[in-house]
C-alpha cells in the first residue's frame, strides 16, 4: 500500500461492525480498497479507540476524517442505533489529533456514494440505461435501502457539488395497491396500529409479510427469520416465494413514489444488505411494473433507471465522496 500524501480516514459505523479505510482526495478513485478493514464494535469502548487501533495497525497518521454512523447526527453528537456508543465529534477529533472530522448519517453516505459509482458497481433492474455523468452536470438521484430498517434519501448535484438529502421516508405510511395488500395491511395494523413502509420493506418486513400471508391462509408459520424465508423461497416453498414476490412489488411501488416526491428523474439506487439477496427476484418480479405504474406519469417513470448497488463498501465509498466534496467547498462555506 502506498499511503496518500494527505490521507483522510473514512469510516462506516453500524450497530455490529465498524469499517475503516483511507481515502485519497486527489485520486480519481479516492477510496483505497486495499486499506479497508472491519472490526466488531463490541471490542472497543468508543469510536475513537477503534479508529486509533485501525490507524496504528495500518501505520498511517491521518489528520482528517469522515465517519458515517448508523444513527441520527445531532450537532456535535451522534448515537448509533442498537449500540451504546455516544459519539462526540469534538472529543473524537481531539483524541485522534484531527484538524477536521465530519460526522454524517450512514444513509447520507450511501447517497454520496452515487457520485463515485462506476457501471461495474451496479446492476440494472429496469428503465433506461445509466452511466456516470460528469460532476458538472445537474442531477437528481434517489436512494432507498432495505436492511434492518428502510433508509430513504437522495443526492442533488449542482455546479460540481453534491448535496445528500436525508429523510425519514421509511416511516411514511404504507399505501396498499391491491386487495391482497389491503388484507396484509389490516393484519399488520392489528399488531402495530399505524403501519409504515419500514414494517414491510426491510429484513424484519419479510417476516411480517410472511406472517400475514400465513394468517390469510389459516396457517401458523412458527418463528422465522428473514434468512429462513429467502432459503425457503429458493427451495421452492410457495408461501415464501409469494412473500418475496410481494416484497419486491411493494418495494417497487414505494421506490416509484419516492421518485415522484423527490423529482429523482435521473435514477434510483437500491442499496442495503438485503438487495443482493433478492436481486434475481427484483429483476423478475413486479418491481418495475409497480415502480412505473404511476397513472399520468407512467410514461416518464418507464425511463427512470433503477439500479442495484453491488459495491462491497458503498458506505466507505460515500464517506470518501463526502471528503472529496468537502475539498470543493469555498473558503468559509460550511460542509
From Swiss-Prot:
Keyword Kinase: yes
A Pfam family recorded for this sequence: Glucokinase
Catalytic activity: D-glucose + ATP = D-glucose 6-phosphate + ADP + H(+)
Residues that coordinate or bind ATP: 11-16
Top EC group: transferase
Stretches that traverse the bilayer: none
Keyword set, alphabetical order: ATP-binding, Cytoplasm, Glycolysis, Kinase, Nucleotide-binding, Transferase
GO MF terms, alphabetically ordered: ATP binding; D-glucose binding; glucokinase activity
Family membership noted in the UniProt record: Belongs to the bacterial glucokinase family.
Protein name (database record): Glucokinase
Lineage, broadest ranks: Bacteria, Pseudomonadati, Pseudomonadota, Gammaproteobacteria, Lysobacterales
Gene that encodes the chain: glk
